[in-house]
Regions:
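N-terminal glycine-/serine-/threonine-rich phosphate-binding loop
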Residues: 2-44
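A generic structural motif
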Residues: 16, 59, 157, 245, ...
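Active-site beta-strand/loop signature of hydrolases that rely on acidic residues for catalysis
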Residues: 35-63, 68, 75, 86, ...
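Eukaryotic helix-linker segments that join adjacent hydrophobic helices
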Residues: 61-116, 120-127
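Active-site catalytic loop in hydrolytic enzyme cores
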Residues: 69, 112-210, 215-229
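CN hydrolase (nitrilase-like) catalytic-core segments centered on the catalytic cysteine
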Residues: 121-134, 195-292
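A short, polar/charged loop-to-alpha-helix boundary motif
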Residues: 155-169, 288-308
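A conserved C-terminal secondary-structure "cap"
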Residues: 299-333
Length: 333
């Protein structure tokens, strides 16, 4: 007799960055602890783009064509110090970083960390304690450069894997695999307007992604249409999340003083979309710290492949080829 599959509960949380990075990490921890006690409890939570470290909306850093200001450089100092150090190398150590094979890396709690600032270990601890697979956007510093990044934190064995964007390595587009409640999930992320890059999207579809993550800072009404298109193209579940906050929540260094304005700087707009493009939850507007949760059946991805598989039967790979430097885009095992 066929059994009904147990639903996988997916969630997006549009929390906003707080005044300091330790405060933001603590807020993430509290949100996950609270969610773990919920009914239903999410199996996976996605937090927004640059949630840890902050998205510097409205900041010009004193820059115009041909000129920089001392005040702008001071802004950058503040922003740089809010970024986190995950212990990777500037060129990206890949699997060596994941497996803790770099000099100074070791298993253990934050007090024994000799590489990085302990953020990786804090996130792994939260995942272990709550049993929730955590995916969050963050701003990472490596050497003298900042990167907009996504980190995946699996609750099993404290493992984590990180995806760097911007000037990161093309090999970091590799999808991540995990099992939740016995269900095989292949997940990958594209940050903000990277989702407008058709070849990048196709590199993820080619890896047979069934959970597509899109942390963003785009609050335009057109964003939902893009997320529905991605879900239909990839025949995958799509989670998109954006921060929601008012001007008074922005850091003082951004404008020189703390604003008292109650106007929204970012209205959110987080959503969850099915493999056939149906909006399951959202978009969630003007709800600071709001969270959406929905139970899904990943067999819906297979049901969608009956008539469309853009990286398979529809791809015409006899005529078109996509190669990504340093990346194997075949589905991960």
């Amino acid at each position: 007799m066929a059994t009904t599959p147990q639903p996988i509960y997916l969630a997006v949380c549009q929390k906003h960055t707080l005044s300091t990075t330790p405060e933001t990490l603590e807020a993430l921890s509290q949100q996950c602890q609270k969610a773990a006690k919920g009914d239903p409890s999410p199996d996976l939570i996605l937090f927004p783009e640059a949630y840890i470290g902050g998205y510097p909306r409205g900041a010009a850093f004193g820059s115009v064509v041909g000129g920089r200001t001392a005040e702008g450089r001071e802004q950058f100092v503040n922003y740089f110090k809010d970024a986190v150090d995950l212990g990777d190398t500037p060129e990206g150590a890949g699997e060596k970083w994941v497996r803790r094979e770099l000099e100074g890396q070791e298993e253990g709690d934050v007090t024994r960390v000799r590489r990085g600032d302990g953020t990786r270990e804090q996130l792994e601890r939260v995942a272990r304690e709550t049993g929730i697979f955590i995916v969050t956007g963050l701003v990472e510093r490596a050497g003298g450069t900042l990167y907009c990044a996504v980190v995946y934190v699996c609750p099993k064995l404290g493992g984590s894997e990180r995806l760097i964007w911007g000037q990161g390595q093309p090999s970091s587009l590799r999808a991540v695999t995990t099992k939740i409640k016995g269900v095989h999930i292949t997940l990958a992320a594209a940050i903000c307007w990277e989702n407008y890059m058709p070849l990048l999207r196709y590199s993820l579809y080619s890896q047979n992604v069934n959970l597509y993550l899109a942390p963003t800072a785009d609050e335009r009404d057109s964003w939902l249409a893009l997320m529905r298109a991605v879900a239909c193209e990839g025949r995958c579940f799509v989670l998109s999340v954006n921060q929601c906050f008012k001007k008074q929540k922005q850091p003082a260094w951004l404008h020189g003083e703390k604003s008292e304005s109650g106007d929204f700087v970012s209205r959110g707009g987080s959503c969850i979309v099915s493999p056939l493009g149906e909006v399951l939850q959202g978009p969630l507007w003007e709800d600071e710290d709001g969270m959406l949760t929905v139970g899904v059946d990943f067999d819906d991805c297979l049901r969608g492949r009956l008539d469309l598989d853009v990286a398979g039967s529809y791809s015409r790979n006899d005529a078109f080829k996509l190669t990504v430097t340093g990346l194997d885009i075949s589905p991960p095992i």
